Amino acid sequence: MAEFSSNDIDPIETEDWIQAIKSVIREDGLERANFIINTVKKYVPYKNKVVFKKCAISNYVNTIPVEEEPNYPGDLFIEQKIRSVIRWNAIMMVLRASKKNLDLGGHLSSFQSAATIYEVCFNHFFHATNENNGGDLVYFQGHISPGIYSRAFIEDRLTQKQLDNFRQEIDGIGLSSYPHPKLMPNFWQFPTVSMGLGPICAIYQAKFLKYLEHRNLKCTNNQKVYAFLGDGEMDEPESKGAISIAAREKLDNLIFIVNCNLQRLDGPVIGNGKVIDELESVFKGCGWKVIKVIWGSKWDSLLKKDVSGKLIKLMNETLDGDYQTFKSKNGAYIRKYFFGKYLETQELVKDMSDDQIWNLDRGGHDPKKIYAALSKANSIVGKPVIILMHTVKGYGMGDIAEGKNIAHQIKKIDIKGITYIKNRFKVPVEENELKYLPYVSFDANSIEYKYLHARRKKLGGYLPIRLSNFTNFFTLPKLDEFSTLLTEQKKEISTTIVFIRILNILLRNSFIKDRIVPIIADEARTFGMEGLFRKIGIYNFIGQKYTPQDKELLAYYKEDKKGQILQEGINELGAAASWLAAATSYSTNNFPMIPFYIFYSMFGFQRIGDLFWAAGDQQARGFLIGGTSGKTTLNGEGLQHGDGHSHIQALTIPNCISYNPAYAYELAVIVHDGLQRMYGPSQENIYYYITTMNENYVMPGISKNMYEGICKGIYKLKHVGKKNVKVQIMGSGSILQCVCRAAEILLEEYDIGSDVYSVTSFTELARNGQDCDRWNLLHPTQEKKVPFVTKIMNKLPAIAVTDYMKLFSEQVRAYIPAVTYRVLGTDGFGRSDSRKNLRRYFEIDEYHIVIAVLGELEKIGDVDKNTIVNAISKFKIDINKVNPRLA
């Protein structure tokens, strides 16, 4: 039997209900009827069962009915005058830049569609950072940057000269195209292009604020995270990929505001559908509070008169492609093709002129509707909020761009179009001045000037604004605290285990232990980190309500509201977004944290390189640990896991400092150096990428002459053979063991001595060499600078061997002083097998190193060809094997 019968057992009662609802519609309108029905739904429990099935998509009307709208707290007239000037200056900025014929680009239409939304926020919601409040964190939609510059200009925070240099940054006085903290370090906080990164970063930023609060590190409970997004941007996987996380974490400090102008760059977002409906169903289904702002106040009376319900029916069934077309036409067109669909809706507007119909506004352009939505959003407890604002792309630009597919590409406007915009928004500019594309500002004694500054003063100050360096200083550990790792280790261990020991040392340091943020993407046991579960706990905002299966074990899975580990599950992008929030906490919160995100090195830069690039832009400071690195060192996982190129990807980010250490003391020195550089007096805007391996071997102790070379990228590890040294062999990471074995074979079998070098960073050596080259080119009369690697090495033939592509060690070729230089690497797709077999397959084992050395010595006449032939035979090298790069 069905839970609810479809049979009408009392038609008379049913008719009474229908007539009652019709009466409400007739007397008070459809919105009131909807309100009553929805209220009834909330209060009709039946044996704990759901009586009314919830629909994921509500009617295409505002979520907040007119009777629930709060009074608007500002002066609408003054705000409109201010908003019009901001709109104008944003357009002038782009037009003046375009006039220079520098092909600079720039976007006009996005901000025009969102201007009212931003201004309501600036006047009534955005709290700035001040002595009493950490301030709201705002992710501004990238394409609307001219509007934010325009507001900062009338606030006297930016100058006309800066506006005139929009997208002209080389001379140091320009404004960046989009929000870029790297380029405007005292202004923008968050880079929001490429699109999709803003939403996911906002989610994990909100989570990190909760993390700080729950760990009693910083009070963040008054802060909100706003993410301004485009409806087209919501198609990015990153935009919606973590929204269930936000609901699961009950991030009621997070508000998404989606500018639903129904257009993306080329055309409609969903021309044959309704993007607002789609987003409502997706977010509502994930547990978000959804607030729709569809129609402006001019629709209120029409909706109230809609006794038949046909207007709402019409709104529900009209497609986005048609809504866009309507706003690109005129009132007569809308009367015929929208209202004219039904007699009832045609009747609703019979007394309205075409101009009145045209001026029926969308909710995202009505300050009162916007304020009501934002006010409601700020009151929601226990869940994140998304506000869907219905707007028009190119709003106010008329025939130039309003509602047109070309709106995103418009960068130039003729004098007729400029005049139209001036008149549309009543901008105080004389007709004869229009050809000069003048900016407009307010006199310091004007009502508008006083008003906008008073609003910002009430909200704590101005934004966006960014803190370049933290003032919340703390004591860093000395190198002596890592002494147990600087001496020879008693047993064979891997550098991954060394990293865990470093982490434990830092967690014992009373000055910084609370600032350490271990971050993992569900691989803690892989990396041997499970011992930290009980020690510092896994962060969970509600603690641990269940009894963990392994509770009796010492290292049981302990979740805690004050837990320190951020366990992000199988979610590399989310883990990296958490890392970015922690790595920029020094700026966003003036509370520096020290994040260590450890991951399979193959699933770092290759998988989420876009976010790591954004981290460079955002001036992140922290550590990325590429675990189980090296194509042959992670031996059993195969093609998708074998990392032979993460260091090459890392070197593309200028402020990412990368190392591939081989020994415990190297890793300890590198981490200590990183702490000093990022969190010490110099506060360098860099972050570290360090690869660690899972291969166990003997870890020797450090010598006094090694410290500088470890940090700069190379040092001489040892001489093999006191006499007859003929070759230099460079090794990196685990492959240094193969290098050392090859050096012994060369000595024992061929009486060839070697200088063995440990290269901790080919990338840093290459950058140093390039810097020296540049200096020498530009300063021809001054003493030449010598690259560090050139000073350390000599003219003997050199071989470089790594577990990475040949390109990794090729980057230093120009600075190697050797008479010949050969590199061995692991180009090609990975395989699963033993380390021994893999290294033989990729031709980087000790025997191939020996052959390579003999080959280089043959070039200078130190050995003959027969020696090489015999060695190939002796070591059973298959000369007919397919090149591993091609296999």
UniProtKB/Swiss-Prot annotation:
Gene3D superfamilies: 3.40.50.920, 3.40.50.970. The keyword Oxidoreductase applies. Keywords: Oxidoreductase, Pyruvate, Thiamine pyrophosphate. The lineage of its organism: Bacteria, Pseudomonadati, Pseudomonadota, Gammaproteobacteria, Enterobacterales. InterPro entries: PDC_E1_N, PDH/Transketolase, PDH_E1, PDH_E1_M, THDP-binding, Transketo_C/PFOR_II, Transketolase-like_C_2, Transketolase_N. CDD domains: TPP_E1_EcPDC_like. Its EC number is 1.2.4.1. One of its GO terms (molecular function) is pyruvate dehydrogenase (acetyl-transferring) activity. It catalyses: N(6)-[(R)-lipoyl]-L-lysyl-[protein] + pyruvate + H(+) = N(6)-[(R)-S(8)-acetyldihydrolipoyl]-L-lysyl-[protein] + CO2. This is Pyruvate dehydrogenase E1 component. Its cofactor is thiamine diphosphate. It holds the Pfam family PDH_E1_M. Component of the pyruvate dehydrogenase (PDH) complex, that catalyzes the overall conversion of pyruvate to acetyl-CoA and CO(2).
